[in-house]
Amino acid sequence: MLLVDVANASADVAAMSARLAKVARIAELLRTAGRQGDARLVRVVVSWLSGELTQRQIGVGWRSVRSVPDPAAQPSLTVEDVDARFGEIGSTSGKGSQARRAALLAELFAAATAVEQVFLRRLLTGELRQGALGGVMADAVGKAAGVPSAVVRRAAMLGGDLPAVAAAAVTDGESALAQFTLQVGRPVGPMLAQTATGVADALDRFGGTALFEAKLDGARVQIHRRGDAVSVFTRSLDDVTARLPEVVDATLALPVTELIADAEAIALRPDGRPHRFQITASRFGRRGGTPDAGTQRLSVFFFDLLHADGVDLLDLPTGERIATLDATVPREQRVDRLLTSDPEAAQAFLDATLAAGHEGVMAKSPTAPYEAGRRGAGWLKVKPVHTLDLVVLAVEWGSGRRTGKLSNIHLGARDPATGGFVMLGKTFKGMTDEMLAWQTERFLELADGAAPAATADHGAAPAATADHGAADGFTVTVRPEQVVEIAFDGIQTSSRYPGGMALRFARVLCYRDDKTAAEADTIDTVRALHERAN
């Protein structure tokens, strides 16, 4: 299969708004791949259209593809060739590896046509936003293979790998999906939570009673044990066993021989309060597989059980899974929780959890099963919403459904000491179609100098520099006049921005035309919030 076939399909899907049309177009491509009888080919295509490489990370970022050779006139690259080239780039190491990687990348782009270069650039920089998320892809796999979507989703849930499920279904049919069962040692997609506005909202949505759990500001891990063999996986299913020996030891101390559990690994201070998130995250870095990738010891707290000693618990209600967890894990290694129908008791539990330095609470339906790999209605997260009034410093041209619109906004806090602004991050989250249309017109009016026009191959801009601008053809620097109200989950230490801080999970609430830039929140306010949280 030629790369251009995948690139054209990606462009088609990005231009479609109807879910059924997206599903049909992807299914058409998967059927074409399946007719070649190569399971690996199907797996690669599904991975790419999901915005991922089969190799996960190959050491290529925006700067690597910012300047590429002129495109080829005719398509010649095959999917197999490109996948092999990605593998070669990713495995390049040692002296001169950077130059070698650049040369391999240049050769690849020189052989690619214009539409292929656009696809490759977006794929390699994580900007392939085309609306082909997991649900759409699962439906497309089902349509291509003639398999009910529910069967595909279940297999992907248990196998933790939709591309592998797609390869089996498209090449060998529904019977091939029987191999995807819950297996100790093979990670499954974690169940995710929806959002509630508060504890009363959560109680109402669960019929009056809910299980509330402390939401720790650590790193979620999935732990597998068979005998003396323990594996620890991240939320994204990466194996981090060698980096977390204390988690392995804690698991081996439990009175079971087989186990699959959900837990939170977190760095705690001597007084029991959490360290800032970066301390925990340092133990999950990519600097090798030894504990010295971070020096702070982690504590592990278990909160759910998917399998215990030969018994699968996925389909059991939360209450029964928790009862098995309580019989397996000591109290001091379990996340704090409260089962209640009393809104005041639930609020007091939330307040105490926040006072202890944690993120908020999870509210869970006592009767819900574990929906692996899905954002299930049986789990709700309740966290305080922080907001800041910030100033837009620059905007990037969008991609996918945002093509032709100014989208990703650069956010800055006012610096009273200098009269300037300090960048704290970027976001396009929370923007409606109406907002995108309005802000495109607005920010072109505020453009500081000649604004670069949107082009067919625009993508995300590279990381912002200290002056927050980027003369890269994708970013429009604007006069710092427009105030925007931003919601965020926290403030983290960051070396990426000149203020040393960045917003976590920033999203747009609304534009504040009633405020001037002089009324925006200051960097001192942001710094105080950061220090208070840490």
Swiss-Prot record:
PROSITE patterns: DNA_LIGASE_A1 (PS00697), DNA_LIGASE_A2 (PS00333), DNA_LIGASE_A3 (PS50160). It is an enzyme of class 6 (ligase). Its EC number is 6.5.1.1. It catalyses: ATP + (deoxyribonucleotide)n-3'-hydroxyl + 5'-phospho-(deoxyribonucleotide)m = (deoxyribonucleotide)n+m + AMP + diphosphate. One of its GO terms (biological process) is cell division. One of its GO terms (molecular function) is metal ion binding. CDD domains: Adenylation_DNA_ligase_Arch_LigB. The active site is at K215 (n6-amp-lysine intermediate). The keyword DNA damage applies. Keywords: ATP-binding, Cell cycle, Cell division, DNA damage, DNA recombination, DNA repair, DNA replication, Ligase, Magnesium, Metal-binding, Nucleotide-binding. Gene3D superfamilies: DNA ligase, ATP-dependent, N-terminal domain (1.10.3260.10), DNA ligase/mRNA capping enzyme (3.30.470.30), Nucleic acid-binding proteins (2.40.50.140). ATP binds at E213, R220, R235, E264, F303, R375, K381. Its cofactor is Mg(2+). InterPro entries: ATP-dep_DNA_ligase (IPR050191), DNA_ligae_ATP-dep_bac/arc (IPR022865), DNA_ligase_ATP-dep (IPR000977), DNA_ligase_ATP-dep_C (IPR012309), DNA_ligase_ATP-dep_cent (IPR012310), DNA_ligase_ATP-dep_CS (IPR016059), DNA_ligase_ATP-dep_N (IPR012308), DNA_ligase_N_sf (IPR036599). It comes from the Bacteria. DNA ligase that seals nicks in double-stranded DNA during DNA replication, DNA recombination and DNA repair. HAMAP family: DNA_ligase (MF_00407). Belongs to the ATP-dependent DNA ligase family. This is Probable DNA ligase. It comes from Mycolicibacterium vanbaalenii (strain DSM 7251 / JCM 13017 / BCRC 16820 / KCTC 9966 / NRRL B-24157 / PYR-1).
